[in-house]
């Protein structure tokens, strides 16, 4: 764990702030998956041990509280990596089992993120700061929104074949209509509904969108 002296540093955490739905296959090789799993397990073990020690001490409580927050934040960061891996796998192979697992993992992550936010706000207030708290709490809210909106994200994939390009549109959970346009305009519920991959033979701008219930 890194010794972090203020709550400001505790939210400047790269893993939590990286985009959830920007997928790069190299992130999901077996070595990275295994390393993140170990990272998650060890950070949670440290977190539990710190909680136990915190309940037994009578001095230096603020130091333990900062360490607990840091350990839990590290754990939640590893949870986000795991969720991202799972969402990517579901996008590539949208079976009922994978979709159900991704939705369950999303709920678990949101619960943990909510607890992390509460711990962060408590630590911030303990420092008696009256400024910028909303700036950092909004980052937590954005992370949660990205998870909640994951099902509406449309992934546009293209395959070049001779003189034409085939366009495929996908969502992670494959459970709602996809609306699209090929003239660069923003799609709405009156736009074309995607049913199967389609070919384009000239330069155009494809835009697609889903709309939640």
Predicted regions and their residues:
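Substrate-binding groove of N-acetylhexosamine-processing glycoside hydrolases
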Residues: 1-154, 158, 177
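Short, compositionally stereotyped local motifs that mark structural "simplifiers"
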Residues: 143-213
